[in-house]
Design a protein with these regions (language model features):
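C-terminal alpha-helix plus adjacent terminal tail
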Residues: 1-13, 44, 54-56, 156, ...
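Crotonase-fold acyl-CoA enzyme core
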Residues: 2-7, 85-193
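Hydrophobic alpha-helical segments that mediate membrane insertion or helix-helix packing
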Residues: 18, 37, 51, 108-109, ...
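Glycine-rich acyl-CoA binding loop
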Residues: 26-30, 105
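Hydrophobic alpha-helical membrane-association signature
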Residues: 33-36, 78, 215
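A short acidic, glycine-rich active-site loop
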Residues: 69-78, 149
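Hydrophobic alpha-helical segments typical of transmembrane helices
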Residues: 78-82, 136-139, 148, 195-198, ...
Length: 235
Protein backbone atom coordinates (compact mmCIF):
# COMPACT_ATOMS: atom_id res chain seq x y z
CA UNK A 1 0.00 0.00 0.00
CA UNK A 2 1.46 3.42 -0.90
CA UNK A 3 2.38 5.71 1.96
CA UNK A 4 -0.30 8.43 2.36
CA UNK A 5 1.07 11.92 1.74
CA UNK A 6 -1.69 13.45 3.88
CA UNK A 7 -2.49 11.78 7.20
CA UNK A 8 -5.63 12.49 9.20
CA UNK A 9 -5.58 11.40 12.83
CA UNK A 10 -6.85 12.45 16.26
CA UNK A 11 -5.27 15.60 17.65
CA UNK A 12 -5.29 17.44 20.99
CA UNK A 13 -8.44 18.82 22.69
CA UNK A 14 -10.86 17.30 20.20
CA UNK A 15 -9.00 18.68 17.20
CA UNK A 16 -8.42 16.57 14.10
CA UNK A 17 -4.76 16.56 13.02
CA UNK A 18 -4.11 16.94 9.28
CA UNK A 19 -0.46 16.15 8.65
CA UNK A 20 1.54 16.73 5.47
CA UNK A 21 3.79 13.71 4.95
CA UNK A 22 5.72 13.67 1.68
CA UNK A 23 9.26 14.07 2.99
CA UNK A 24 11.03 12.93 -0.18
CA UNK A 25 9.57 15.97 -2.00
CA UNK A 26 9.61 18.39 0.96
CA UNK A 27 5.81 18.17 1.03
CA UNK A 28 5.58 19.59 -2.50
CA UNK A 29 1.94 19.65 -3.52
CA UNK A 30 0.82 17.29 -6.27
CA UNK A 31 -2.69 15.98 -6.94
CA UNK A 32 -2.01 13.04 -4.64
CA UNK A 33 -1.65 15.53 -1.78
CA UNK A 34 -4.10 18.26 -2.73
CA UNK A 35 -7.12 15.99 -3.22
CA UNK A 36 -6.99 14.38 0.25
CA UNK A 37 -6.03 17.73 1.78
CA UNK A 38 -9.16 19.35 0.36
CA UNK A 39 -11.27 16.38 1.48
CA UNK A 40 -9.87 16.60 5.01
CA UNK A 41 -10.80 20.27 5.36
CA UNK A 42 -14.22 19.81 3.75
CA UNK A 43 -15.23 16.86 5.97
CA UNK A 44 -17.05 17.64 9.22
CA UNK A 45 -16.73 21.44 8.84
CA UNK A 46 -17.47 22.13 12.51
CA UNK A 47 -14.54 19.99 13.69
CA UNK A 48 -11.42 22.02 14.55
CA UNK A 49 -8.22 21.11 12.70
CA UNK A 50 -4.52 21.24 13.53
CA UNK A 51 -2.42 21.39 10.33
CA UNK A 52 1.24 20.43 10.55
CA UNK A 53 4.06 18.52 8.87
CA UNK A 54 5.41 15.09 9.72
CA UNK A 55 8.88 16.48 8.94
CA UNK A 56 9.74 19.21 11.47
CA UNK A 57 12.35 20.59 9.08
CA UNK A 58 9.94 21.68 6.36
CA UNK A 59 6.32 22.78 6.27
CA UNK A 60 5.60 22.80 2.51
CA UNK A 61 7.73 23.57 -0.54
CA UNK A 62 4.72 24.70 -2.58
CA UNK A 63 3.42 23.20 -5.79
CA UNK A 64 5.40 20.30 -7.25
CA UNK A 65 7.33 21.81 -10.17
CA UNK A 66 7.97 18.43 -11.82
CA UNK A 67 4.35 17.86 -12.87
CA UNK A 68 2.83 18.71 -16.25
CA UNK A 69 1.32 22.12 -16.97
CA UNK A 70 -2.16 20.59 -17.06
CA UNK A 71 -1.69 18.99 -13.64
CA UNK A 72 -0.22 22.21 -12.26
CA UNK A 73 -3.34 24.10 -13.31
CA UNK A 74 -5.54 21.48 -11.65
CA UNK A 75 -3.44 21.64 -8.47
CA UNK A 76 -3.77 25.42 -8.41
CA UNK A 77 -7.54 25.32 -8.80
CA UNK A 78 -7.93 22.73 -6.03
CA UNK A 79 -5.62 24.65 -3.71
CA UNK A 80 -7.73 27.79 -3.98
CA UNK A 81 -10.81 25.70 -3.26
CA UNK A 82 -8.96 24.36 -0.22
CA UNK A 83 -8.13 27.87 1.02
CA UNK A 84 -11.77 28.88 0.65
CA UNK A 85 -12.93 25.85 2.64
CA UNK A 86 -10.38 26.63 5.36
CA UNK A 87 -11.67 30.19 5.68
CA UNK A 88 -15.38 29.40 5.57
CA UNK A 89 -15.55 26.19 7.65
CA UNK A 90 -16.92 26.78 11.16
CA UNK A 91 -14.23 24.80 12.94
CA UNK A 92 -11.01 26.75 13.51
CA UNK A 93 -7.74 25.77 11.81
CA UNK A 94 -4.40 26.10 13.60
CA UNK A 95 -1.26 25.77 11.47
CA UNK A 96 2.02 24.69 13.04
CA UNK A 97 4.89 25.86 10.85
CA UNK A 98 8.45 24.60 11.15
CA UNK A 99 10.91 25.11 8.32
CA UNK A 100 10.11 26.78 4.99
CA UNK A 101 6.62 27.45 3.66
CA UNK A 102 6.78 28.50 0.01
CA UNK A 103 4.16 29.52 -2.55
CA UNK A 104 1.13 27.31 -2.07
CA UNK A 105 2.61 26.17 1.24
CA UNK A 106 2.80 29.76 2.48
CA UNK A 107 -0.81 30.22 1.43
CA UNK A 108 -1.85 27.06 3.28
CA UNK A 109 -0.29 28.46 6.43
CA UNK A 110 -1.81 31.88 5.83
CA UNK A 111 -5.30 30.53 5.22
CA UNK A 112 -5.31 28.97 8.69
CA UNK A 113 -7.08 30.97 11.36
CA UNK A 114 -4.14 30.88 13.76
CA UNK A 115 -0.46 30.27 13.01
CA UNK A 116 2.11 29.01 15.50
CA UNK A 117 5.69 28.92 14.21
CA UNK A 118 9.00 27.47 15.26
CA UNK A 119 12.17 29.60 15.23
CA UNK A 120 13.24 27.87 12.00
CA UNK A 121 10.06 28.82 10.12
CA UNK A 122 10.38 30.92 6.98
CA UNK A 123 7.98 32.09 4.30
CA UNK A 124 8.23 32.99 0.63
CA UNK A 125 5.28 34.10 -1.49
CA UNK A 126 6.31 33.16 -5.00
CA UNK A 127 5.12 30.92 -7.83
CA UNK A 128 6.89 28.80 -10.46
CA UNK A 129 9.42 30.60 -12.69
CA UNK A 130 8.17 32.04 -15.95
CA UNK A 131 4.58 32.38 -14.75
CA UNK A 132 2.93 35.74 -14.05
CA UNK A 133 1.08 34.49 -10.99
CA UNK A 134 -0.23 36.37 -7.99
CA UNK A 135 0.66 34.30 -4.93
CA UNK A 136 -1.09 35.36 -1.76
CA UNK A 137 -2.13 38.84 -2.90
CA UNK A 138 -5.68 37.90 -1.87
CA UNK A 139 -4.63 37.06 1.68
CA UNK A 140 -1.61 39.08 2.76
CA UNK A 141 -3.30 42.52 2.93
CA UNK A 142 -5.55 41.16 5.68
CA UNK A 143 -2.54 39.94 7.65
CA UNK A 144 0.22 42.52 7.11
CA UNK A 145 -1.37 45.48 5.29
CA UNK A 146 -1.44 46.38 1.60
CA UNK A 147 2.01 47.93 1.23
CA UNK A 148 3.95 45.10 2.84
CA UNK A 149 1.72 42.54 1.12
CA UNK A 150 2.67 43.95 -2.27
CA UNK A 151 6.35 43.99 -1.30
CA UNK A 152 6.29 40.33 -0.31
CA UNK A 153 4.35 39.15 -3.37
CA UNK A 154 6.25 41.32 -5.88
CA UNK A 155 9.76 40.56 -4.62
CA UNK A 156 9.28 37.00 -3.43
CA UNK A 157 11.80 37.64 -0.65
CA UNK A 158 12.12 35.36 2.35
CA UNK A 159 10.53 36.24 5.69
CA UNK A 160 12.08 34.57 8.72
CA UNK A 161 10.22 33.62 11.89
CA UNK A 162 11.17 36.73 13.85
CA UNK A 163 9.96 39.07 11.12
CA UNK A 164 6.84 36.96 10.56
CA UNK A 165 5.89 37.43 14.21
CA UNK A 166 6.70 41.14 14.15
CA UNK A 167 4.56 41.91 11.08
CA UNK A 168 1.64 39.67 12.09
CA UNK A 169 2.20 36.89 9.58
CA UNK A 170 2.21 34.41 12.48
CA UNK A 171 0.58 34.76 15.88
CA UNK A 172 3.54 33.57 17.93
CA UNK A 173 6.96 31.92 17.62
CA UNK A 174 7.75 29.16 20.10
CA UNK A 175 10.73 26.87 20.62
CA UNK A 176 8.26 23.96 20.75
CA UNK A 177 5.45 25.05 18.41
CA UNK A 178 3.64 21.71 18.54
CA UNK A 179 3.27 21.91 22.30
CA UNK A 180 2.17 25.54 22.09
CA UNK A 181 -0.44 24.63 19.48
CA UNK A 182 -1.84 21.94 21.79
CA UNK A 183 -2.26 24.54 24.56
CA UNK A 184 -3.94 26.91 22.10
CA UNK A 185 -6.26 24.14 20.93
CA UNK A 186 -7.32 23.56 24.54
CA UNK A 187 -8.03 27.27 24.98
CA UNK A 188 -10.22 27.30 21.87
CA UNK A 189 -12.02 24.14 22.97
CA UNK A 190 -12.81 25.75 26.33
CA UNK A 191 -14.63 28.59 24.53
CA UNK A 192 -17.19 26.18 23.08
CA UNK A 193 -17.90 25.29 19.45
CA UNK A 194 -19.87 28.39 18.45
CA UNK A 195 -17.48 31.20 19.35
CA UNK A 196 -14.83 30.42 16.74
CA UNK A 197 -17.38 30.04 13.95
CA UNK A 198 -18.99 33.38 14.79
CA UNK A 199 -15.63 35.16 14.72
CA UNK A 200 -14.65 33.47 11.45
CA UNK A 201 -17.84 34.55 9.69
CA UNK A 202 -17.18 38.19 10.50
CA UNK A 203 -13.46 37.99 9.65
CA UNK A 204 -14.22 36.52 6.21
CA UNK A 205 -16.51 39.43 5.35
CA UNK A 206 -15.31 42.58 3.61
CA UNK A 207 -13.88 41.26 0.35
CA UNK A 208 -11.50 38.48 1.41
CA UNK A 209 -13.36 35.79 -0.53
CA UNK A 210 -13.77 38.11 -3.52
CA UNK A 211 -10.00 38.61 -3.66
CA UNK A 212 -9.40 34.87 -3.31
CA UNK A 213 -11.69 34.10 -6.24
CA UNK A 214 -10.16 36.87 -8.34
CA UNK A 215 -6.64 35.54 -7.73
CA UNK A 216 -7.75 32.00 -8.52
CA UNK A 217 -9.30 33.10 -11.84
CA UNK A 218 -6.27 35.19 -12.79
CA UNK A 219 -3.83 32.39 -12.03
CA UNK A 220 -5.90 29.82 -13.92
CA UNK A 221 -5.78 32.09 -16.96
CA UNK A 222 -2.01 32.59 -16.56
CA UNK A 223 -1.39 28.86 -16.25
CA UNK A 224 -3.26 28.29 -19.51
CA UNK A 225 -0.61 30.37 -21.30
CA UNK A 226 2.81 28.97 -22.34
CA UNK A 227 5.59 29.54 -19.83
CA UNK A 228 8.24 32.13 -20.63
CA UNK A 229 11.06 30.71 -22.83
CA UNK A 230 13.69 30.85 -20.06
CA UNK A 231 11.39 28.95 -17.71
CA UNK A 232 10.82 26.29 -20.37
CA UNK A 233 14.60 25.81 -20.67
CA UNK A 234 14.98 25.61 -16.89
CA UNK A 235 12.37 22.86 -16.43
Amino acid sequence: MPHPSVRVEPGPAGFRRVRLDRPDRRNALDLGMVRPLHAAFAAEPATPILLDSADPGVFCAGADLTVSDAERAEISGLLYQCYEVMITRLGPVIAVISGPAVGGGAQLAGAADLRVAGPDASFRWTGPPGRALAVGAWLLPSLVGRGLALELTMTGRWVDAAEAERIGLVNRVYTEPGQAAAVLAKQLADQGPGAAGAAKRVAAAGGLLDRLRAERAANQAALAEPAAPQAQRDR
